[in-house]
Amino acid sequence: MNTPPETRPDRPIRSQYEDFMRHVDAHGVFKADRTGTGTKSVFGYQMRFDLNEGFPLVTTKKVHLKSIVQELLWFLTGSSDNNWLKERGVTIWDEWAREDGDLGPVYGVQWRSWPTPDGGHIDQISEVIKTLKTNPDSRRIIVSAWNVADLSKMALMPCHAFFQFYVAPATEAGGKGKLSCQLYQRSADIFLGVPFNIGSYALLTHMVAQQCDLDVGDFIWTGGDCHIYSNHAEQVALQLSRAPFPYPTLHIKRKPESIFDYQFDDFEFLDYQHHAAIKAPVAV
């Protein structure tokens, strides 16, 4: 896998995300796809973001923070109802929702209510919090949204399918461990989807770290089929013509009683400097 240079405070600002986009634009091969749009694609890529160096929001275009935060909170409710999002002014799932708003057993359902053969359910998020608090050295701190038995019932199969947490021990007496998260994304729409996914899982890592009394470490994004849609070529060229700004800083205003009690207003993104938004069609 190709890992671009990390952004460091003592170096000129160079965004891993834009390097990723350049790599796919230069080396991608044409592939047909499910939507009939066509893509320029590479297989396998990785980016590593040190969350202590800022919150990794894309700055070469405006990212819709409200949608990122509300979607993550929606996942954590365990809901499959798009109406929850629409009531909060978020429309990113509208293209896939059924008439009544249902999306089938998508991300939140699998995270919170993975079905078991005996008719029960597993709350994977609660298990993660419990394990991080009681056995942080475990190599099994994993959440999967890729439930093969349920795929045909989903309005959209999971693109970001599987993530794992890792705790690096404290380096000094009385210090805190550092929580890192690695996401595997089987299908990555680089222009529209990946900026959301990076922001969402970076935010989740901060939330889980706060709940488990840990410091944040790295967020590692790993992609499978990484692609630029053919009808995003002009938008990509425009975005790559822009110079990135420094990352903003995330401030979480309070510590709720549980991972499920955060509200939208709990999060503040300080000094988010960005270029103008760039519109592009969604491949459905």
From Swiss-Prot:
Catalytic activity annotation: dUMP + (6R)-5,10-methylene-5,6,7,8-tetrahydrofolate = 7,8-dihydrofolate + dTMP
Localization: Cytoplasm
Record's keyword annotation contains Cytoplasm: yes
GO biological process terms held by the UniProt record: dTMP biosynthetic process; dTTP biosynthetic process; methylation
Its EC number(s): 2.1.1.45
Top-rank lineage group of the source organism: Bacteria
Record's signal peptide: none
Positions that bind (6R)-5,10-methylene-5,6,7,8-tetrahydrofolate: H64, D189, A283
Single GO term (MF): thymidylate synthase activity
CC per GO annotation: cytosol
Active site: C159 (nucleophile)
Keywords, alphabetical: Cytoplasm, Methyltransferase, Nucleotide biosynthesis, Transferase
Positions contributing to dUMP binding: R34, R139, R140, R186, S187, A188, D189, N197, H227, I228, Y229
Function: Catalyzes the reductive methylation of 2'-deoxyuridine-5'-monophosphate (dUMP) to 2'-deoxythymidine-5'-monophosphate (dTMP) while utilizing 5,10-methylenetetrahydrofolate (mTHF) as the methyl donor and reductant in the reaction, yielding dihydrofolate (DHF) as a by-product. This enzymatic reaction provides an intracellular de novo source of dTMP, an essential precursor for DNA biosynthesis.
Family: Belongs to the thymidylate synthase family. Bacterial-type ThyA subfamily.
Subunit structure as annotated in this protein's UniProt entry: Homodimer.
Protein name in UniProt: Thymidylate synthase
Organism per entry: Polaromonas sp. (strain JS666 / ATCC BAA-500)
